[in-house]
């Protein structure tokens, strides 16, 4: 029995299977297995997935940082050298300052030449520098992710990524703006998922996106000073669209024939907000909203409500929309919401993120807001088809006394005027007074719909970790610890690795 208990079962597994198992942990941790026995000496280096992250090494005192950087670079060089020309599935590299730039570019070129299919680059090793051109010329890449902590320049010469399906770029500066973007998209002939966040543009005023294969598009721009002159989207097979940017002067081409879900965070510039007036469009974004009017799921962020008010006329009809989420803000009015809700004839679920809004002259108009009017019942509410109304962050105080009472008044008004409501769910993460709860209980019999139920949910209720079915009330998660390259154990790994592979 003792012999069976002590038997090393894992070491008897096929070497290819062991390498596969080692690919599920960071390469630095997998390297520790080289100390187990002669058989394990090089196995970690032949894992099809390599994950190098210098942040888990930086536990040493600052005085030793140069030595740590040197050992990290030596470690990566040794692992890649041991692998030779073997096939690599995924290569992840996350580096900070102190790692030689030429070494990094050499590693990237090495894995691309070996046919890596998934490349993930992060950190600030290319800050204010151009990404090596070899990244954008690969016959094997299927997924490419570049996320840097500071701005990385994309200055493209050639783009040839015939198999790339997923492209994720963050903190990117497009040099030669529109030309660079067009070259990037046209060089990815089967691209399906494109994410571009924290974007900057060099001398760039007009933007154009055209792709017949794209299914998901996420765009977050960071240029707060310049509005684009013209934007076009020709993406007929797009299913998901997430768009945060300054509103453009015009949207010439908008082709979203297959769109199902959209999340819009458009905003006006400060001077546009200051000079906006009812009846005069600041810029014309109507074509964009017409283009997304066939969606089934729509999320509008607070600034987008202002864009609807001052940059869109008329608000289009959203015939297929069944789920609408609206983020609110104390500095943004609700002038556009009545017309929007009237133009959603099949809306089933309405979600408010907060119940904040700025009082405007339109609040007293018949259909100028959603707050309770002293004149008439809001027709956008009395004719609403909505069955489920969710209010997130209910009771959250924005900045003034009495905000909780105003929110309660709105809730009462919704319940009293929306005839098709079947469920109202109020989510709160602050303390709700007993007075509010009792008023809601009192209101339930007075709701417009006899089918409606009201549910109050606390989002910050305490949760406990489970260990073998036992609830641990006082459990404190220990901080994770990582061995750094000053550890004796890792000091043994590099010299023990040697230069010759165990197998090829």
Swiss-Prot record:
InterPro entries: F-box-like_dom_sf, F-box_AtFBL13-like, F-box_dom, FBD, FBL60-like, LRR_dom_sf, LRR_FXL15/At3g58940/PEG3-like
Superkingdom classification of source: Eukaryota
Keyword Repeat listed: yes
Keywords: Leucine-rich repeat, Repeat
Pfam families: F-box (PF00646), LRR_At5g56370 (PF24758)
Keyword Transmembrane helix annotated: no
Protein name: Putative F-box/FBD/LRR-repeat protein At3g59240
Ranges of residues in domain FBD: 382-427
Every F-box domain range: 7-60
SMART domains: FBD
LRR repeat locations: 69-95, 145-171, 173-198, 286-312, 329-354, 369-396, 403-428
Species of origin: Arabidopsis thaliana (Mouse-ear cress)
């Amino acid at each position: 029995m003792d012999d069976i208990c002590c038997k090393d079962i894992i070491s008897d597994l096929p070497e290819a299977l062991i390498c596969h198992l080692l690919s599920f942990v960071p390469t630095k941790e997998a390297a520790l297995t080289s100390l187990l026995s002669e058989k394990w000496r090089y196995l970690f280096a032949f894992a099809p997935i390599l994950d190098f992250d210098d942040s888990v090494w930086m536990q040493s005192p600052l005085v030793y940082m140069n030595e740590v950087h040197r050992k990290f670079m030596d470690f990566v060089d040794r692992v890649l050298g041991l692998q030779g020309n073997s096939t690599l599935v995924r290569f992840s590299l996350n580096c900070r300052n102190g790692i030689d730039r030429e070494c990094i570019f050499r590693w990237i070129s090495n894995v691309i030449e070996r046919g890596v299919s998934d490349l993930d680059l992060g950190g600030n090793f290319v800050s204010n520098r151009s990404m090596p051109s070899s990244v954008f010329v690969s016959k094997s890449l299927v997924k490419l992710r570049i996320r840097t902590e500071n701005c990385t320049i994309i200055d493209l010469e050639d783009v040839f990524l015939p198999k790339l399906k997923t492209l994720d770029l963050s903190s990117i500066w497009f040099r030669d703006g529109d030309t660079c973007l067009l070259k990037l998209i046209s060089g990815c002939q089967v691209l399906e998922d494109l994410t571009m966040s924290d974007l900057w543009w060099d001398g760039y005023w007009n933007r154009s996106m055209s792709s017949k294969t794209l299914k998901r598009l996420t765009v977050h721009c960071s240029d707060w000073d310049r509005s684009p002159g013209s934007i076009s989207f020709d993406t007929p097979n797009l299913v998901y669209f997430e768009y945060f940017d300054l509103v453009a002067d015009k949207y010439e081409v908008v082709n979203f024939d297959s769109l199902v879900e959209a999340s819009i965070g458009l905003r006006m510039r400060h001077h546009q907000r200051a000079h906006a007036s009812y009846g005069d469009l600041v810029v014309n974004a109507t074509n964009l909203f017409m283009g997304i009017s066939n969606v089934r799921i729509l999320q509008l962020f607070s600034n987008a409500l202002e864009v609807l008010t001052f940059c869109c006329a008329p608000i289009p009809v959203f015939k297929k929309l069944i789920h609408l989420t609206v983020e609110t803000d104390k500095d943004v009015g609700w002038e556009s919401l009545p017309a929007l809700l009237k133009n959603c004839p099949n809306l089933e679920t309405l979600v408010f993120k907060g119940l904040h809004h700025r009082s405007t002259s339109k609040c007293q108009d018949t259909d100028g807001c959603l707050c309770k009017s002293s004149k008439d019942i809001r027709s956008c509410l009395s004719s609403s088809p909505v069955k489920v109304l969710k209010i997130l962050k209910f009771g959250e105080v924005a900045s003034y006394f009495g905000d909780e009472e105003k929110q309660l008044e709105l809730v009462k008004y919704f319940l009293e005027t929306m005839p098709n409501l079947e469920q109202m769910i109020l989510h709160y993460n602050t303390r709700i007074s007993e007075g509010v709860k009792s008023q809601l209980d009192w209101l339930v019999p007075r709701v417009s719909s006899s089918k409606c139920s009201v549910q109050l949910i606390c989002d910050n209720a305490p949760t406990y970790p489970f260990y073998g079915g036992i609830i641990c009330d006082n459990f404190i998660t220990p901080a994770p610890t990582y061995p750094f390259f000053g550890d004796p154990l890792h000091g043994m790994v590099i010299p023990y690795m040697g230069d010759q592979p165990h197998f090829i």
